[in-house]
């Protein structure tokens, strides 16, 4: 019976081992770059505002415990805005007669989209991302979005 004679020394072993390790890392990076990214929705950060059908078009709904207002626009879209004034952080209220949010501290006023109507506030109310799942409205209450102006991309449609 013949024995295998592997003429391998320590240096060549480590050299091959190192090349193998580098190759594996390179392959891993390439696979990660080519693999499509899927975003997993972590529902722990979301507040369930209720069923979509329970919100009438053109109405604003306060969620005091979450410190936000949910606006169902006339065109059916949803916009969740913070109830915290962007001037000094006072809690704002909604005035249905004037159709505006008003700050009791320094009289800042915001329209129903959260845009500044009267100073001293200089920027719109923060808004919260919204997702729809199983016919429910979920609001990401841990992720308020600071904005410099209102744009239609901030409104979420079914």
Positions of PLM-derived features:
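N-terminal secretory signal peptides
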Residues: 1-8
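N-terminal pre-ligand scaffold of iron-sulfur
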Residues: 6, 15-86, 90-97, 126-158
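Short cysteine/histidine-rich metal-coordination sites, predominantly Zn2+-binding motifs
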Residues: 99-107, 117-126
